[in-house]
Amino acid sequence: GELKNKDIQEETHQVMHNLKNILQEAGMDFSDVVKTTIFITDMHQFGAVNEVYGKYFENRQSDRQPAFPARETVQVSALPKFVNVEISMIAVKL
């Protein structure tokens, strides 16, 4: 589908919502995520992206795992369809 030009926080919410749907299709949720990679086109937007990203892991902390999965954030010169953020996730169902 076509993407509407949104601000970075709206884009991040949309990406996380899409990832939530993919996880649910696999019988998982954000508590099963072990690693993420965030690609952004402007590192100055890191704080805005991080604020949204963190909300999706608010209920994750337990004795068996940290509050957030391992993560790196990388600035890239461009992303497909001129979006400003892309997130890759690895999830494991134990």
What are these regions (language model features)?
Residues 1-94:
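Short, polar/acidic, helix-capping and beta-turn segments at strand->helix junctions
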